[in-house]
Amino acid sequence: MVKRASFCLLSCLIILFLSSVSAIIYDPQDKQVYVVYMGSLPSQPNYTPMSNHINILQEVTGESSIEGRLVRSYKRSFNGFSALLTESEREGVAEMEGVVSVFRSKNYKLQTTASWDFMGMKEGKNTKRNFAVESDTIIGFIDSGIWPESESFSDKGFGPPPKKWKGVCKGGKNFTCNNKLIGARDYTSEGTRDLQGHGTHTTSTAAGNAVADTSFFGIGNGTARGGVPASRVAAYKVCTITGCSDDNVLSAFDDAIADGVDLISVSLGGDYPSLYAEDTIAIGAFHAMAKGILTVHSAGNAGPNPTTVVSVAPWMLTVAATTTNRRFLTKVVLGNGKTLVGKSVNAFDLKGKKYPLEYGDYLNESLVKGKILVSRYLSGSEVAVSFITTDNKDYASISSRPLSVLSQDDFDSLVSYINSTRSPQGSVLKTEAIFNQLSPKVASFSSRGPNTIAVDILKPDISAPGVEILAAYSPLSLPSEDRRDKRRVKYSVLSGTSMACPHVTGVAAYIKTFHPDWSPSVIQSAIMTTAWQMNATGTGAESTEFAYGAGHVDPIAAINPGLVYELNKTDHISFLCGMNYTSKTLKLISGDAVICSGKTLQRNLNYPSMSAKLSESNSSFTVTFKRTVTNLGTANSTYKSKIVLNHGSKLNVKVSPSVLSMKSLKEKQSFTVTVSGSNIDPKLPSSANLIWSDGTHNVRSPIVVYIDGY
């Protein structure tokens, strides 16, 4: 009774405490950092962005001094600022003339090599290169910074930066740029040096030099290199260990665009998709697109659940993660001679010595000392020799001690062996790299569609290697998640859509070296329409276009796509009209006069994929898609259409006209795709592929229809 009363008292106190904390957190008089987005920079010659931002703050706060209020002013590539505001002040700013949106600055998360060989970009003379243009290509990475001393970013053999470069090297104390790493900016007050390893990893994946004999303690030995090793890189550090704030991210876009980068790579994202006017990555990417800069963005790591993709704007290229043909496996050898195969990146070698196996989830340290602990939960034991556990992940993680992660069936087999054997023994071997013939397969963690903001725009767009990627790393960051890990490495293995994103960034840069004048939409179209068609290796929604988009990126095919689907800023503004943005708001965003007339259907945006969300009540349906293609292949070519239904699809698809005769380069022709059917499964999309072929080029677009059942 006494114990129960004490528990009740403690519970009540906790509830009161949490209530008071909650009240403090949601006090409307508390000042929070808000982003104030004001669209494009006004063209008036006497307009000074920062002065205008200060005037707004003075007016809304009633204070002549706004010291400590203005956090950042966005004034180089677009207009806006971030500031400390109360809720009532936020409301006041939102009602002011010239303001598009005001939203709280949230934190994004980081979305955490043989892969280039796997995609067909072999090292050396086997891959066609245009080194002169590649050396003039600049990629900006908005991430956790960079390790400038890494061999992956050595400037040996590089000339001075391209003349178009307008950036700076402000990396902080003891940070030096060079002719490879030509720019660095910090928005965190930590300096641009990478303390987490993530930014170093992504940058080297896309554009790192070829560095021979790299490995993780002998695992995955080979040459680490990026897709465009001759290109230049610039690091924009927006992330700390606590996250990547909206106001930092928007500042990085503001600078990167004005600095003169050719591409922007963003391997971070939120927990859920946001409306475009409140999504700093979508905002920054829009203004980048308007300046001819493609933004490549990771899809997110919240899969395999549907509607989890966070990168949903059509003006940026959204990347899902897949496996490659190399997997890391860690074998467990039992005392009875049986071998079980698990996953991990285990650099420790027990040299085949067998130790007693102890099974249990919550064991006293004295019971596991000098033994291999077998548990359903990864233990923090410091006295066990090794660990064997189980989970349903389809990728390997680095361990700080000998570890193998078994499938549930193999784990059950191991437990059965322990329970039926008087003195069970075993050993965990060092990880080995094996050939994976089932690749590529979409990783379970990769976020899935459908798109919840623009429901008729298919996302993700493309998939690329993002599982067990070996690339450069920061020696200041732990290789594992165990804080007791004392090892430090220059190259490490990571998995995530963060790792997939820079692969596509590298491909986009590779395309740009052959076609410097291609617009962001043309590069995006080339990547999507030449992708490998993915084969569903599983069942259910996680094995559909909502998982992989148009397919798996094919770098070599993408430099010669034949036909492309072009889009420009005006097309995207019309699309936003159809999303119910007002003419007044869109004039602020675009900087141009805008009149939204009529209803523009999302699905008629000239996008390389076609998607339509149907009403749940639709037992039978007919939808149309209008598209225009531009000939970038050869003159006097004839393209014939072909429809290929995917497994289980009963769609009826017609293309009109079914033949396109292109007399000249850059000629445009339009067509309509009509899709009809009935009784669509509410849990699965129904899909097909439209292929335009002239005998040399095969220009493929996925067609997806789905019920509002997600």
UniProtKB/Swiss-Prot annotation:
Keywords: Autocatalytic cleavage, Glycoprotein, Hydrolase, Protease, Secreted, Serine protease, Signal, Zymogen
Biological process annotations from GO: proteolysis
Glycosylated residues in this chain: N174, N221, N364, N419, N535, N568, N580, N618, N636
Ranges where the Inhibitor I9 domain occurs: 33-110
Protein name as it appears in the record: Subtilisin-like protease SBT4.8
Source organism per UniProt: Arabidopsis thaliana
Pfam family membership, one: Inhibitor_I9
EC number: 3.4.21.-
Residues forming the catalytic site: D143 (charge relay system), H198 (charge relay system), S498 (charge relay system)
